[in-house]
């Protein structure tokens, strides 16, 4: 167990003075000092009890008979990287397997909002993930989900978190604050539940996470800032980034598997000269394939540097800035006395190869390989078998009827590649035998939201464009932010029914059916959201899914992540939920057929 600085301080002082030996000394490195913005050559670091005791020239006086010595050989000594906002569930793996995947990439601290599992299992799911996080050798702080469901009245999730639930959870150990406040209209309207949650968080001295997914930077935005959220990761333009910082919020710039928002917003620093101290890098959503093949926060830092940031600035935005934002500056986010001994050794600050990773003074990864033993975490039976459709679905469950017409104008959800927002489109579609037909030639296929929490048998149908499928196929997923019912997208209703029924059989996941044949399946038995297998195994299955989607004509980058967001009724413009088709710009339901 890591001792607080206040308890271990006498021991740190003794080591720094040379009266007692360090546990570990890293010698001959170039110290990346995120406080001064310097690269300090010829630095040694002495560590004891999982914390930095001495950082400076020649730590020979701290070396004793049992001290382990690592020669950095002139390489850079960088603070462990922090992810300022993320959802573990997006990796399709448990917290343990996510940690195993990202430690070799230099991520040593994560700030996690488990609102995905909360929408399925409620407060019990949040506690499960928080308990699991505390068993791990890295720093995983948990935020209490603020909006479950994300938009009351516009969707029904598998569970509801009340203001009382939130208040109770804020007192748990390891809780760092309130998760992203997605109900931005509620904040602007002084909704009593939102006000109560924010007040409880502030009273506890914790941080309120933000989520302002609107291009409107007028009164509603200013009201949102006045309501209390301390950060926001939903910006996509340079003006978004600047507006948030000007209002005293941290602007979180995200590079996830499907979100590429750093390039545009980092110009606030590189071109507009805005002080970088209030900018934080994060991933938000990273799937297992990205983690295994491309990295995690090291990927984000590299990308930020490629967009014009100085390496030291990009590193500050993934270490010190993040720690300061969450009130943890005196505990982590830098290589300085008293802080947790989270340390990366790298030979290149631009390419950022992660060669050695220490967390709390313990060697966890070397040369891109996890060297520590991290045991698996067993989820209880109550977290599994969560897909309850109430019946086997038939092709006719996906009919959209329009009696008495030969052609109708319909609303269509338009997918935007690499972005979370969608477009509200309209198209004219033919009607045959009273049923509206898809138009595959014009890239208009069907989408269905299948209720899967309470076995109601409910199916909401609509149209979607942007996937580019050019054959009979359907993909179904129980990862369907944020309510996590089941989303089915297809060009063929028989395949849609088969895909939905298959996921009920396996207890959740993602499946692609083409012409009655199963092309790919990713089983996600934990809440229908996560696998308890290794990230490498899940990534391989997900890779086969992507290949199958491409074989069916879909060329979108990270298409299945785009698929998973089509029910996210807090991001404009048009979404689907168990209530119906949702106009997010107006926060109200609307009809598929334009009257």
Swiss-Prot record:
Keywords on record: Hydrolase, Manganese, Plasmid
Coiled coil: none
Gene this protein is translated from: ade3
Keyword Mitochondrion belongs to the record: no
Protein's recorded name: Adenine deaminase 3
Family: Belongs to the metallo-dependent hydrolases superfamily. Adenine deaminase family.
Reaction equations catalysed: adenine + H2O + H(+) = hypoxanthine + NH4(+)
EC class (word): hydrolase
């Amino acid at each position: 167990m890591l001792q607080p600085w206040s308890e271990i301080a006498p021991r740190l002082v003794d080591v720094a003075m040379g009266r007692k030996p360090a546990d570990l000394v890293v010698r001959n490195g170039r110290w990346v000092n995120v406080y001064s913005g310097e690269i300090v050559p010829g630095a040694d670091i002495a560590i004891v009890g999982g914390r930095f005791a001495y950082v400076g020239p020649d730590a020979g006086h701290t070396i004793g008979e049992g001290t382990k010595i690592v020669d950095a050989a002139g390489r850079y000594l960088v603070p462990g990287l922090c992810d300022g906002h993320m959802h573990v569930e997006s990796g399709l793996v448990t917290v343990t397997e996510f940690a195993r995947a990202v430690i070799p990439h230099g991520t040593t601290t994560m700030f996690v909002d488990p609102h995905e599992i909360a929408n399925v299992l409620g407060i019990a799911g949040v506690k499960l993930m928080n308990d699991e996080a505390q068993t791990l050798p890295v720093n995983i702080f948990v935020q209490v989900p603020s909006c479950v469901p994300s938009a009351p009245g516009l969707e029904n999730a598998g569970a509801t978190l009340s203001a009382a639930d939130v208040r109770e959870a804020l007192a748990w150990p390891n809780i760092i604050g309130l998760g992203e406040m997605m109900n931005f209209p509620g904040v602007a309207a002084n909704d009593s539940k939102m006000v109560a949650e924010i007040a409880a968080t502030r009273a506890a001295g914790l941080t309120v996470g933000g989520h302002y997914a609107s291009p409107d930077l007028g009164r509603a935005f200013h009201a949102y800032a006045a309501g209390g959220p301390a950060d926001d990761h939903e910006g996509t333009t340079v003006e978004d980034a600047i507006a948030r910082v000007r209002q005293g919020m941290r602007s979180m710039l995200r590079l996830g598997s499907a979100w590429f928002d750093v390039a545009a917003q980092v110009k606030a620093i590189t071109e507009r000269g805005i002080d970088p101290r209030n900018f934080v890098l994060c991933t938000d959503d990273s799937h297992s394939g990205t983690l295994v093949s491309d990295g995690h926060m090291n990927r984000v830092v590299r990308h930020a540097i490629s967009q014009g940031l100085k390496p030291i600035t990009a590193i500050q935005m993934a270490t010190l800035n993040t720690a300061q934002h969450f009130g943890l500056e005196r505990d982590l986010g830098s290589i300085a006395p008293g802080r947790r001994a989270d340390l990366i050794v790298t030979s290149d600050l631009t390419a950022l190869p992660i060669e050695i990773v220490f967390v709390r003074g313990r060697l966890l990864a070397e040369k891109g390989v996890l060297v520590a033993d991290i045991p698996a975490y067993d989820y209880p039976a109550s977290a599994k078998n969560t897909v309850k459709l109430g019946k086997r679905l038939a092709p006719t469950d996906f009919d959209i009827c329009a009696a008495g017409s030969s052609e109708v104008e319909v609303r269509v959800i338009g997918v935007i590649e690499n972005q979370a927002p969608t477009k509200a489109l309209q198209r004219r579609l033919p009607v045959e035998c009273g049923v509206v037909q898809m138009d595959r030639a014009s890239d208009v296929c069907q989408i269905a939201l299948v209720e899967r929490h309470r076995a109601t048998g409910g199916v909401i149908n609509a149209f979607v464009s942007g996937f580019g499928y050019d054959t009979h196929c359907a993909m179904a997923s129980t990862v369907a932010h944020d309510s996590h019912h089941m989303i089915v997208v297809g060009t063929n209703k028989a395949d849609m029914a088969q895909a939905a029924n298959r996921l009920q059989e396996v207890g959740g996941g993602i499946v692609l059916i083409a012409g009655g044949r199963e092309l790919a399946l990713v089983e996600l038995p934990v809440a229908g959201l996560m696998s308890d297998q290794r990230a490498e195994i899940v990534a391989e299955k997900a890779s086969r899914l992507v290949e199958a989607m491409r074989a069916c004509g879909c060329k979108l980058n990270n298409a299945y992540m785009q698929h998973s967001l089509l029910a996210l009724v807090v991001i404009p413009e048009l979404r689907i939920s168990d209530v119906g088709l949702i106009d997010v710009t107006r926060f109200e339901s609307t009809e598929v057929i334009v009257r």
